[in-house]
């Protein structure tokens, strides 16, 4: 099994090209099921989860072809299966996003209950309740969600009990082909939701309010394929910016989206970074200074993203001062803390809050990735730790970061993939 071997690397410097957003690409690929003609998606990152999504679409009978580094073409002409099997779904929670498109276009879907990162319960009840309000008959048995509808789904007024990105996306796709108007209240506002909505609009959907907490969808009878470019990955961008801050370096992220990262950039400035932005780039310069400790509380967008929490644990571990990081989105999302403690970090957990006392140096150690973003934090820690750090179970990392070792090498990082 692959591992990453990391040596202390000094200040990162240079330009890094940001990949397409995993969390936008996955729902957009699933939306291909809604299109009656060929659907061409570009800026698709080469990741394990993307490969799983393509395999799932092929399993349903769709023709999926990849060309170049970042292009995917989907044709549903021969789609004739309506079951997303456990073997595929168990490795990726986002497989649940096939439910809405299959049900909306074909009237039936059997989807295995999902797997993915081990960071909390993340129930699917909001997806199911919304689809039931749109007229679907749903039962959960033998580990599968079995959904049926006679004719088209019906537009509905849906109030979501809690903000859920996945449920908002599933209902958005289902409502695009429903009969009548659907209103989703307390909808997720994440940029990836907006990207999906923009893609659906390019396919012929009628959607208003994406990016606000109330989204209105006027259902149409059919959607057509289009050419669509996935947005840049704001979490990959943030991860490289934190790595530069921790190593006291200066880097520029190219093909980035500064507007989607405002909460993260504000915290990096609080930590002492000088931030400059253009339309599609972000430059961070620490001017050789040690970061200052910053308090973090994860909240739904436009607040501070839970997917950047682990990286800021590393920043605070090496910062000047003491900070608290409070996780409000997922339970069980501090599994990186014991691993960072093995490297010498001074951290203590109290419920959903981590108290971090900054120290000057970490020490290299053998550590284990427990989920996608935790694994990124361990790589960042390895870049500034004395000695060698080995990160095991990096299949988590490959789910969400494209060519991460090559990108760090391009910035001067000593990161190697080994067996």
From Swiss-Prot:
Keywords, A to Z, come to:
Cell cycle, Cell division, Cell shape, Cell wall biogenesis/degradation, Cytoplasm, Peptidoglycan synthesis, Pyruvate, Transferase
The UniProt entry annotates the active site at 117
Record CDD domains: UdpNAET
Give compartment(s).
Answer: Cytoplasm
Cross-referenced Pfam families = EPSP_synthase (PF00275)
The residues the record assigns to binding phosphoenolpyruvate are 22-23
- Which GO MF terms does the UniProt record name? UDP-N-acetylglucosamine 1-carboxyvinyltransferase activity
Reaction catalysed by this chain?
phosphoenolpyruvate + UDP-N-acetyl-alpha-D-glucosamine = UDP-N-acetyl-3-O-(1-carboxyvinyl)-alpha-D-glucosamine + phosphate
EC number(s) recorded for this UniProt protein: 2.5.1.7
What Gene3D superfamilies does the entry give? Enolpyruvate transferase domain
Matching InterPro entries, A to Z? Enolpyruvate_Tfrase_dom (IPR001986), Enolpyruvate_Tfrase_sf (IPR036968), MurA_subfamily (IPR050068), RNA3'P_cycl/enolpyr_Trfase_a/b (IPR013792), UDP_GlcNAc_COvinyl_MurA (IPR005750)
Instruction: State the pathway, as annotated in the record.
Output: Cell wall biogenesis; peptidoglycan biosynthesis
* Name by which UniProt lists this protein: UDP-N-acetylglucosamine 1-carboxyvinyltransferase
Q: Which organism is it from?
A: Shewanella piezotolerans (strain WP3 / JCM 13877)
